Amino acid sequence: GGGMMVLNPETLSLKYFAQGGDGDAELFQKGHIFCVRPDEKENLWIGTSQGLFCYNRQAKQIKHFTSANSQLPEGNVYEVSFDSTGKGWIATETGMCIYDPASQSLRSNVFPEGFVHRDKVRTIYEDTGHNLYFIREKGSLFTSTLTMDRFRNRSVFSTLPDNSLMSIVEDNQGWLWVACNDGLLRIKEEGEEYDAFTFNDGVPGPTFTNGAAYKDEKGILWFGNTKGLI
């Protein structure tokens, strides 16, 4: 890994993140950093190969969650996603947990039977209807309400290979765009049918990059593809 660097937007200079403890210096210079996400209090959450870090930028303090001092499942922390209620969804190599902002703790014992908390989840996304979508390393698209009282596998993707889903984003018209390793799909949240976009539609390459989908302030969608940015 190459650690984590901080960009100064005024000078365009880069420097290594150096706010961790003495034992964390090597991680932030040479270790594996998988994701960096802000919460509603402007803390930065950093998923790494050595656990989960929460950095308070105002106080310049950092907290380190591991499987030894919390209910964080073991392994690499691949995804951190905060929903519209402020709750944090944490996905690791071996499963999931939830960050409860009220108790400021991680909890892995809150999931109902049949949920995806034991799978390797790589992407978690909330749409404007407050539905959550989980993209696993293997398996179909999984969707749930914020309270986990209703959840299911999306049967529309049952014909796709298990490892084909890469990223997801919603456009301003309510369509969900799902990037795969064999093209780009567009679906309606309530529908079970989809439109497929391939080379004939201007997609430069069939394979999209894991987790690389973004909607900007103008509503334009951006996707990472092995042939470049589209």
Regions found by a protein language model. Give the residues of each.
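Carboxylate-rich, polar loop motifs that coordinate divalent cations or form catalytic acidic clusters
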Residues: G1-I230
